[in-house]
């Protein structure tokens, strides 16, 4: 009888452990899905439109700024989650901005040192990451309320979702506007990445509509339409 009770207890414990493990896995998956698709910063929340529209004239510029933004998001989420219990609620926003500004400054110095040509190309939009609503929004909505590991994963997922949207938009505008893709990628990853540059078609003059800001609005509209169409089909 005692053996049977012990076996039943062990089985119950295994079931509980399995349920907890499955719940943890579903949390990680949901955070990732929110960042990449369900709550994508660019095509769902429509945040960070200033760099999205201004810098996405080429895939290389878009990828460079999006990687910088992803790094800042991940780092700020990490720091804010780590010290969330010590940050006074009354002055939390100024503290978040200081943390974000410090991280952006570090990223800016790194880009100035290692990717100088891209740094010059992006110009004012690197320091403007400080004012990006995505970063302060994730700090307030997620990092200040959740565990360290979940906050790191949320920052990475949201940053990756932003990076994918920005790079796709940049690639679309570059292909239609100039007939190339990843032109100047060596400025970001070095000469070994030059094989990624491709000339899709030859043109004597650029298609200015897609290179200039109106092309960014058209491209973003196409991305929004495609995403909404996919969501409607899934329903």
Curated annotation (Swiss-Prot):
UniProt keyword terms in alphabetical order: Cell inner membrane, Cell membrane, Electron transport, Membrane, Translocase, Transmembrane, Transmembrane helix, Transport
CC per GO annotation: plasma membrane
Role description: Part of a membrane-bound complex that couples electron transfer with translocation of ions across the membrane.
Subunit structure: The complex is composed of six subunits: RnfA, RnfB, RnfC, RnfD, RnfE and RnfG.
Name under which the protein is recorded: Ion-translocating oxidoreductase complex subunit E
Subcellular location: Cell inner membrane
Residue spans crossing the bilayer: 63-83, 93-113, 117-137, 152-172, 206-226
Family stated for the protein in its record: Belongs to the NqrDE/RnfAE family.
Coiled-coil intervals: none
Record's keyword annotation contains Transmembrane: yes
Gene name in the database record: rnfE
Pfam families: Rnf-Nqr
BP GO terms, sorted: electron transport chain
Bilayer topology annotation: Multi-pass membrane protein
EC number in record: 7.-.-.-
């Amino acid at each position: 009888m005692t053996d049977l009770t012990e076996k039943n207890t062990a089985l119950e414990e295994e079931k509980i452990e399995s349920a907890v493990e499955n719940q943890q896995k579903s949390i990680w998956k949901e955070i990732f899905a929110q960042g990449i698709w369900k709550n994508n910063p660019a095509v769902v929340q429509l945040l960070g439109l200033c760099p999205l529209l201004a810098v996405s004239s080429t895939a290389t510029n878009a990828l460079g700024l999006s990687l910088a933004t992803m790094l800042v998001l991940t780092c700020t989420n990490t720091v804010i989650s780590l010290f969330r219990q010590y940050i006074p609620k009354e002055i939390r926003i100024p503290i978040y901005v200081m943390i974000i500004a410090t991280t952006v400054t570090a990223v800016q110095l790194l880009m100035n040192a290692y990717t100088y040509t891209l740094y010059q190309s992006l110009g004012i939009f690197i320091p403007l990451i400080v004012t990006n609503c995505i970063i302060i929004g994730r700090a307030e909505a997620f990092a200040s309320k959740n565990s360290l590991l979940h906050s790191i994963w949320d920052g990475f997922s949201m940053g990756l979702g932003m990076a994918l949207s920005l790079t796709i938009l940049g690639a679309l505008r570059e292909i239609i506007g100039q007939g190339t893709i990843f032109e100047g990628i060596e400025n970001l990853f070095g000469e070994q990445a030059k094989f990624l540059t491709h000339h899709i078609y030859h043109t004597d003059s650029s298609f200015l509509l897609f290179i200039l800001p109106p092309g960014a609005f058209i491209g973003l509209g196409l991305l929004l339409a495609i995403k909404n169409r996919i969501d409607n089909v899934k329903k």
